[in-house]
Amino acid sequence: MTKLSVNINKIATIRNARGGNTPNLVEAAIKIQEFGGQGITIHPRPDERHIRYQDVYDLKPVVTTEFNIEGKPVDSFMELVLNSKPEQVTLVPDAEDAITSNAGWDTIKHFDYLTDVIKTFKEAGIRTSIFLDPNPALVEAAAKTGADRIELYTEEFATQFGLGNLEAINPYKETAKLAIENGLAVNAGHDLSLDNIEYFIREIPQISEVSIGHALISEALYLGLENTIQAYLRKIEVANL
């Protein structure tokens, strides 16, 4: 069964807009798990524009499901992850000026770099995932880095699905199939929503985990956080039947 990890960056963005501690990220993480969320995802950036590095240490004791930290493996990020020891780290090639993640790794071009980083995390007992575009040509190199998983960057699927182009799922299916054949588990995330999650997982039932933040928090404004999480879980369950 595909697991739902809730990305709480958007909650941190709301908090930071006023400079205080409302909404409280720790309380939000506790509630998300009580409501059925099967993991908590955060994506700290060096400028701390949403998740602050201190948030990682505050959240670690209360995440009783799975803690997934995403980010570009610069020195400060690596130190943060090694000190906090989440269940999973997802490596993302963030551009400094990017509003949000907008591309996966070129695992061929950055093979040596990724291999060294992944070795460090795996020696610390941390499961490692590589953020990847839906490109089968990048899968073999991803597997050879020593990574445990890939996370499919699903923005293009979400955009095309919204336009009615269901064939946009095909490169994701091909990439996921090849990843599994190469011994990698497959996660997915970015712009997945209540509108498209069921179709995506039905077409790729091997997905181990989805990480959803922006859409889920936005939908929760209308439906409530508990109702929204439960709605995702129902759609995932139906898709996995």
Predicted feature locations:
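Conserved N-terminal beta1-alpha1 strand-loop-helix module at the mouth
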Residues: M1-P86, E167
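Histidine/lysine/aspartate-rich catalytic loop segments that bind and position anionic ligands
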Residues: R127-A179
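Catalytic cores of alpha/beta
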Residues: D75-S84, N135-T145, A188, L192-I207
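Glycine-rich phosphate-binding active-site loops on the catalytic face of alpha/beta enzymes
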Residues: L91-A98, R149-F161, P205-L225
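Alpha-helix-loop-beta-strand connector modules within alpha/beta enzyme cores
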Residues: R49-D75, K109-S129, N165-A188, L194, ...
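C-terminal helical cap(s) of enzyme catalytic domains, especially alpha/beta-barrels
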Residues: K60, A103, G164, E219-L241
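Glycine-enriched alpha-helix->loop->beta-strand junction motifs that scaffold or abut catalytic
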Residues: G36-Q38, V62-T64, N83-V89, E123, ...
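Hydrophobic faces of well-ordered beta-strands that scaffold small-molecule active sites
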Residues: T2-I8, I40-I42, F67-I69, V89-L91, ...
